[in-house]
Amino acid sequence: MFQNNPLLSQLKQQLHDSKPHVEGVVKGTDKAYGFLETDKETFFIAPPAMKKVMHGDKIKATIETIGDKKQADPEELIEPMLTRFIAKVRFNKDKKLQVLADHPNINQPIGAAQTKAVKEELHEGDWVVATLKTHPLRDDRFFYAQIVEFICRAEDEFAPWWVTLARHQQSRYPVQGQDSYKMLDPQTRKDLTALHFVTIDSESTQDMDDALYIEPLEQNGEQTGWKLTVAIADPTAYIAADSQIEKDARQRCFTNYLPGFNIPMLPRELSDELCSLMENETRAALVCRLQTDLQGELQGKPEFLLADVQSKAKLAYNRVSDYLEQAEGAWQPENETTKQQIHWLHRFALTRINWRKTHGLLFKEKPDYSFVLADNGHVQEIKAEYRRIANQIVEESMIVANICCAHYLADNAKTGIFNTHAGFDKKFLPNAHHFLMTNLSNAQNQDELTVRYSVENLATLEGYCRMRHDIEPIDGDYLEFRLRRFLTFAEFKSELAPHFGLGLTGYATWTSPIRKYSDMVNHRLIKACIAEQACLKPSDDILTRLQEARKQNRMVERDIADWLYCRYLADKVENKPEFQAEVQDCMRGGLRVQLLENGASVFVPASTIHPNKEEIQVNSDELAFYINGERRYKIGDIVNIQLTEVKEETRSLIGNLVL
């Protein structure tokens, strides 16, 4: 009687339309139920309704009121959480193929089938790439996925690398090379093979892209300054601008340096052989000659030229540092000329460090953490490595060469790829001013600092550098860590602009063309200037891709490191080891800290810090953790923690504070 009744259908539609409708994001739990988080409110999703959605789905829902509680009924999919995703293979009790998405908040198995492109026979636990083909809210069917790519077997020790590269859609292989290479540059090269160039790198480095030669400038028998010659490997001498190698390098943008090995931007026969500035081998190079006075101030204009060079000594960072620091039993230079070069470069670097400390900005010393791996990929140890004097020699030489490049390109090419940083994000300038005044001003200096740290002054390179110099002597990292959250991102631009982070009016890298595509572009522009040819402005597409690739590479490195930390600490957690750690973030849910010994990131849940969550407050302006109105922890604080749990499936470490 009521079947196909138009009045009943109309009544149902009216009832439906009268209910509140919301848009939000599904938040899964480790139970069968979930929640819908909207801009203003969070709604309960009952277990039957959760079967139609997945954590992270953006959906439309109607709100039902049952008793005194509101709950969401999912109706329409706006954007699925999963499209292309990484998964592990599993088989249900009926031996039907399924996949489990590799995501900490998604635990429901998804029915799957493999495409014809995947030839491997799949086993439980294998890693694959899948795409979601059907969704209950969109297709009126169950969740269903297709396996489109095989990554590696479950037992593959290098799964952290292969899975992470697949997640970020990066190749595990070098760029495909050519059968042979020939010199493409028509210009004559200056023969500088007689100069005693040296390279300083890690002992294992094969892709050596910079060599240095230095001599003092003298007048009437007295030293007046330094003349530094920087020779940089010249891959564009062998790579045509329209070649496939160039196109592949433009897509990759950077050599990917991963724990244990690297994936080069260029074919290995170029990066590690033909272009590498190997000891006693003549190599094509792009060379910059620059001069400074004894205070490290650049004098005159730099000279760029094409040359043939020959490194006379392959030196290693640690050996040179041990030698200069006069460590017991330290390595000694093989001859007097190399010894002289090391000492002159050392003096030059100290001069430039002092110049940058006064006229630019220096970064605070923080260690790099390196994984020492066995051949099978097991982590043997994790070393905290500080930049020693030999690293600083190379760093200062490269920085001054990159400063020269920026102004050379701006003057001659009128374009280039410039590394820029605009300091504080404009929208956070008032916050930065308020924070500085709150933490540094008092009755005596308030008027002075109001002007010194005004929004207008902080927006200028000079004012920003002055502020950084002011806070540098203050103990601890709190001020720097908090101010860092107000900064904008570094950008690649095609016009000269300041780099606030370095405190410089211009900066353009050209010293790593084997490893960075932006440096290859700048090489071509420098060569065009030398040959007095037209210079083409780098396209916005190249700048955008550089930005994307830099972000991707950092995420790849971080994701692999998180996984390796879990593997390394998994067999140690049962002993509840204690570590010193630095607070990196304060959140309502707890503290994020970094272990000083090895760099691992550990989460400390708020529930382990204080039992009553109602008495916990987080001050988002200060990035500080309060208990009963008293500030207990803030970013930059050093705390002691005990490692309590390692979750390799989610690549997370959990700890407690040791009070």
Swiss-Prot record:
Chief subcellular location: cytoplasm
GO molecular function: exoribonuclease II activity; RNA binding
Pfam families: OB_RNB, RNB, S1
Ranges of residues in domain RNB: 189-531
Top-tier EC class: hydrolase
The reaction(s) this protein catalyses: Exonucleolytic cleavage in the 3'- to 5'-direction to yield nucleoside 5'-phosphates
Source superkingdom: Bacteria
Domain (S1 motif) ranges: 576-658
Example GO biological process: mRNA catabolic process
Cell location: Cytoplasm
Residues of the signal peptide: none
Entry keywords, A to Z: Cytoplasm, Exonuclease, Hydrolase, Nuclease, RNA-binding
A single GO cellular-component term on record: cytosol
InterPro entries: CSD, NA-bd_OB-fold, RNase_B_OB_dom, RNase_II, RNase_II/R, RNase_II/R_CS, RNase_II/RNase_R, RNR_Ribonuclease
Purpose: Involved in mRNA degradation. Hydrolyzes single-stranded polyribonucleotides processively in the 3' to 5' direction.
Family: Belongs to the RNR ribonuclease family. RNase II subfamily.
Protein name as annotated: Exoribonuclease 2
